[in-house]
């Protein structure tokens, strides 16, 4: 009995093998002139027609490649098969495992003195000086606003009849309320902010652009009736208001008191030393370009004002 079952089983195996051979020959014949592309293979439909389907299984040979999607594949076939299955375009970036990419996030904004900071410092200085005004008495002469300014100017001038930024800062530091601008959480940045705002005040009335104030320029800067103009930053034929930001690589530039101020971070790259040098040069050129746009805009504005 068992011999009959064995013979029947062998017969069924033989039939299946013959059919498989026939299907393989038929598939080879039908798909002979069909090209399906990477990640696909030709298959025969129930109607006996050729069609292209995603490869069912790749050969397990190990030759890792890194795809353009940042994923490592066992071999080229697996990469193209994944592209077919997901319907996405994936190319071989390079041979071998994908290297971990260092994420470079934009740096924090640079420490800057905005127009609001500058104007607040100026308001506090004027308030302090006005509090020292002494009206003339019956038998004594008081001190008016100009005389008080003259007194401080002479006290902090080093003898050249000009106040530079360090002398101006020493003058402002005489009043703790005036100098106590605390925009940033740490004292180091707030100290830097004070110096930047002093520079911004000097720029307000520095008519000959020597970064020093004569007494007349000093008087104009702190004149209570003087309204500081709102300056904007220029870039690519556009003007940007105080506080506007733009990014270049991993650095951030901020418009402050009419000037672009940028961070000076170096971005990670494959060649660290070369990447840093290149980035620094690019950053310098970029800031120079920003300032050039600003100078052009200022000249155009002055010409337009004269024509009016």
Swiss-Prot record:
Protein name (database record): Follistatin-related protein 1
Glycosylation sites: 144, 175, 180
Pfam families in the record: EF-hand_FSTL1, FOLN, Kazal_2, VWF
Entries under SMART domains matching the protein: FOLN, KAZAL
Originating gene: FSTL1
Record organism: Homo sapiens (Human)
Main location class: secreted
Positions where Phosphoserine occurs in the chain: 165
One GO term describing the cellular component: endoplasmic reticulum lumen
Domain Kazal-like: 48-100
Subcellular location: Secreted
Domain of life: Eukaryota
Function, as annotated: Secreted glycoprotein that is involved in various physiological processes, such as angiogenesis, regulation of the immune response, cell proliferation and differentiation. Plays a role in the development of the central nervous system, skeletal system, lungs, and ureter. Promotes endothelial cell survival, migration and differentiation into network structures in an AKT-dependent manner. Also promotes survival of cardiac myocytes. Initiates various signaling cascades by activating different receptors on the cell surface such as DIP2A, TLR4 or BMP receptors.
Signal peptide boundaries: 1-20
Tissue expr: Overexpressed in synovial tissues from rheumatoid arthritis.
Gene Ontology MF annotations: calcium ion binding; heparin binding
């Amino acid at each position: 009995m068992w011999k009959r079952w064995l013979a029947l089983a062998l017969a069924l195996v033989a039939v299946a093998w013959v059919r498989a051979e026939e299907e393989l020959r038929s598939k080879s014949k039908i798909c002979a002139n069909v090209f399906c592309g990477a990640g696909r293979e030709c298959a025969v439909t129930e109607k006996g027609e050729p069609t292209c389907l995603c490869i069912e299984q790749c050969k397990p040979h190990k030759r890792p490649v890194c795809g353009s999607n940042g994923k490592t594949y066992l071999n080229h076939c697996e990469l193209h098969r994944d592209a077919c299955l997901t319907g996405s375009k994936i190319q071989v970036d390079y041979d071998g495992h994908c290297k971990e990419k260092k994420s470079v996030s934009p740096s924090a904004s640079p420490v800057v003195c905005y127009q609001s900071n500058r104007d607040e410092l100026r308001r506090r200085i004027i308030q302090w000086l006005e509090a020292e005004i002494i009206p003339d008495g019956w038998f004594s002469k008081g001190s008016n606003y100009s005389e008080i300014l003259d007194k401080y100017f002479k006290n902090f001038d080093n003898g050249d009849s000009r106040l530079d930024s360090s002398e101006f800062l020493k003058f402002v530091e005489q009043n703790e309320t005036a100098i106590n601008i605390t925009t940033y959480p740490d004292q180091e940045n707030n100290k830097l902010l004070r110096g930047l705002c002093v520079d911004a005040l000097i720029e307000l009335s520095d008519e000959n652009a020597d970064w020093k104030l004569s007494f007349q320029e000093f008087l104009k800067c702190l004149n209570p009736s003087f309204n500081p103009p709102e300056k904007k930053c220029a870039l690519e034929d556009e003007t940007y208001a105080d506080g506007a930001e733009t990014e270049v690589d991993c650095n951030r530039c901020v418009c402050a008191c009419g000037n672009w101020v940028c961070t000076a971070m170096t971005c990670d790259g494959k060649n660290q030393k070369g990447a840093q040098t290149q980035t620094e040069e690019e950053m310098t050129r970029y800031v120079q370009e920003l300032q050039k746009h600003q100078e052009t805009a200022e000249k155009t504005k002055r010409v337009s004002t004269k024509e009016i």
